[in-house]
Amino acid sequence: MFRLYVLVMGVSAFTLQPAAHTGAARSCPVRGRHYKREFRLEGEPVALRCPQVPYQLWASVSPHINLTWHKNDSARMVPGEEETRMWAQDGALWLLPALQEDSGTYICTTRNASYCDKVSIELRVFENTDASLPFISYPQILTLSTFGVLVCPDLREFTRDKTDGKIQWYKDFLPLDKDNEKFLSVRGTTHLLVHDVALEDAGYYRCVLTFAHEGQQYNITRNIELRIKKKKEETIPVIISPLKTISASLGSRLTIPCKVFLGTGTPLTTMLWWTANDTHVESAYPGGRVTEGPRQEYSENNENYIEVPLIFDPVTRKDLNMVFKCFVRNTMGFQTLRTTVKEPPPTFSWGIVLAPLALAFLVLGGIWMHRRCKHRTGKADGLTVLRPHHQDF
């Protein structure tokens, strides 16, 4: 997109000059190879889109740039003047029909008076045989026991501005009938619906689009290798924390984890989030004092858990009047748990005050008991001394 901007803006200050007389023509860097390789069948139409110019931008960009094609670093532009199978149109290079000898690297060059770059595209044309199938097939994956959709790929250049395109689908080279309850081709789209995907649905599929050009009909074939993956099990999520009331001192930093038990279920499709007074945390605390922490997924004893903490930095009196709720949802169920933040009870305790009094009471009581016992012992000793005198009398 940046290159397109430079190309368009460059014409506002410069008049487009012939390519041979510009500095850009003398130095035109190659930006690299397009990530996608084009694997096509011999005898069918091929359209190579210039990577620098998407179709939706062609109308606005085309008046300001010069677009050319070359093959295999050759100085000769394609298509040649006498070439009847190949032409350039709306930012794409068309080959109709394509031959194996057309295989190679095609370089799209875009330039104006002040800018120029090149991007290459790799094209390989295969003979239409079973041996070519692994090379030209698009891998697509559906999940077992679900409703799936296969897509006939890379047809945009041939279906653009056309509503009458008809696609015939095949499985293992056998046509899929219209009355087939398992497969349904959606008219006007490139989609094949697959009901209740089964393991035996795996294999090679072929979609064929009929394309008309100058009164002649051509087939455009795309092959798909369907792979089936097992459906990951899901269980009903259960929130096991937090507690209904959390104690925290004003001014302290607090983290309240919302921990969810999933058992053997997958955490990938389970959503977990917090609210404050039935509002998203980001909306309730736009300043970011209270936020959701990063999501954690882990296993304990071969059982899966997910956790999202609610972080207070710090706790203020406003938080004491809020109701916080943790929500969890997946395809099996939905659950919520509420919690509130409260100040801890005062640290003053009557036990601290009464403990010294109790100790003093015990000490005084001990002294009183000691004196009483000593007084009684003294009386007993006096009686013992008087007995002999009574006997003498």
Curated annotation (Swiss-Prot):
Topological domains annotated Cytoplasmic: 369-393
Extracellular topology ranges: 14-347
UniProt PTM comment: A soluble form (sIL1R2) can also be produced by proteolytic cleavage at the cell surface (shedding) involving a metalloproteinase.
Residues of this chain annotated as glycosylated in UniProt: N66, N72, N112, N219, N277
Pfam family, one: Ig_2
Highest taxon listed in the record's lineage: Eukaryota
Keywords: Cell membrane, Disulfide bond, Glycoprotein, Immunoglobulin domain, Membrane, Receptor, Repeat, Secreted, Signal, Transmembrane, Transmembrane helix
GO molecular function annotation: interleukin-1 binding; interleukin-1, type II, blocking receptor activity
Intrachain S-S bonds: C28-C116, C50-C108, C152-C207, C258-C326
GO cellular component: extracellular region; plasma membrane
Location of the Ig-like C2-type domain: 29-120, 134-221, 237-342
Signal peptide range in chain numbering: 1-13
Transmembrane annotation, as ranges: 348-368
Biological role stated in the UniProt entry: Non-signaling receptor for IL1A, IL1B and IL1RN. Reduces IL1B activities. Serves as a decoy receptor by competitive binding to IL1B and preventing its binding to IL1R1. Also modulates cellular response through non-signaling association with IL1RAP after binding to IL1B. IL1R2 (membrane and secreted forms) preferentially binds IL1B and poorly IL1A and IL1RN. The secreted IL1R2 recruits secreted IL1RAP with high affinity; this complex formation may be the dominant mechanism for neutralization of IL1B by secreted/soluble receptors.
PANTHER family in alphabetical order: INTERLEUKIN-1 RECEPTOR FAMILY MEMBER (PTHR11890), INTERLEUKIN-1 RECEPTOR TYPE 2 (PTHR11890:SF3)
Assembly and interaction partners: Forms a non-signaling receptor complex consisting of IL1R2 and IL1RAP.
Family membership: Belongs to the interleukin-1 receptor family.
Name of this protein: Interleukin-1 receptor type 2
Organism encoding this protein: Chlorocebus aethiops
